[in-house]
UniProtKB/Swiss-Prot annotation:
Gene label: ccmA
Protein name per its UniProtKB record: Cytochrome c biogenesis ATP-binding export protein CcmA
Organism: Pseudomonas putida (strain ATCC 47054 / DSM 6125 / CFBP 8728 / NCIMB 11950 / KT2440)
Gene3D superfamilies: P-loop containing nucleotide triphosphate hydrolases (3.40.50.300)
Entry binding sites for ATP: G37, P38, N39, G40, S41, G42, K43, T44
Keyword Cell membrane tagged: yes
Reactions catalysed: heme b(in) + ATP + H2O = heme b(out) + ADP + phosphate + H(+)
UniProt keyword list: ATP-binding, Cell inner membrane, Cell membrane, Cytochrome c-type biogenesis, Membrane, Nucleotide-binding, Translocase, Transport
Assembly and oligomerization: The complex is composed of two ATP-binding proteins (CcmA) and two transmembrane proteins (CcmB).
């Protein structure tokens, strides 16, 4: 599908505190939006709004010109969400985690899962229980999903957390390649991106921070 995501007059409150208001932006094929701002400025809340996990205080989000609330099926098909937590099961192996996660959307073959783990530097860790992995390795298990799923919209909350220098460089390249191939990325990160696609821009929520 050709992605067109629009925020119009978007506002969000948490615990009776205004995080942001009157946000207007549009995202399409090839775009990357980095959301920045101090802690507590609403970065994760904005991601959750765009992913359909929260409702805005005011304004609306449109997908393909229609309200997001009316596009649940289309959003589920278009979206890959990876939150700040790795979101994996400690007692499952790396392969089992990816098999389970993919089964929720689009099942993947064992060969594809092993190739994805190799792509994130985890060759040889396929059968290792995730509770024995380091934080960086657990994060890479979660990020291996980016090598398996092909939805156009990737929404990622602090994806570079716990990655080493090589992992950061590999992820930057993969995100840029996704945009160059017509995908869309929305992310939060405190990391300064070295590789940015032509459709990159930044949205700073700091102006509303108390």
């Amino acid at each position: 599908m050709t992605l067109h995501l629009q925020a119009a007059g978007l506002a969000c409150e948490r615990d009776w505190r205004l995080l942001f208001e009157q946000l207007d932006f549009e995202l399409g094929a090839g775009d990357m939006l980095q959301i920045s701002g101090p802690n507590g400025s609403g970065k994760t809340s904005l991601l959750r709004l765009l992913a359909g996990l929260m409702q805005p205080t005011a304004g609306q989000i449109l997908l393909g010109g229609k309200p997001l609330a009316e596009q649940r099926h289309a959003l589920a098909s278009a979206l890959l969400w990876i939150g700040h937590a790795a979101g994996i099961k400690d007692l499952l192996t790396a392969e089992e985690n990816l098999t389970w996660l993919c089964a929720l959307h689009q099942p993947a073959s064992r060969e594809a899962i092993w190739a994805a783990l190799e792509a994130v530097g985890l060759r040889g860790f396929e059968d290792v229980p995730c509770h024995t992995l380091s934080a960086g390795q657990q994060r890479r298990v979660a990020l291996a999903r980016l090598h398996l799923a092909c939805p156009p919209l990737w929404i990622l909350d602090e994806p570079f957390t716990a990655l080493d220098k090589q992992g950061v460089a590999q992820l930057e390249a993969h995100l840029a390649a996704h945009c160059e191939q017509g995908g869309t990325v929305v992310l939060t990160t405190h990391h300064t991106l070295e590789r940015k696609p032509s459709g990159y821009r930044e949205l700073n929520l700091g102006q509303w921070a108390a």
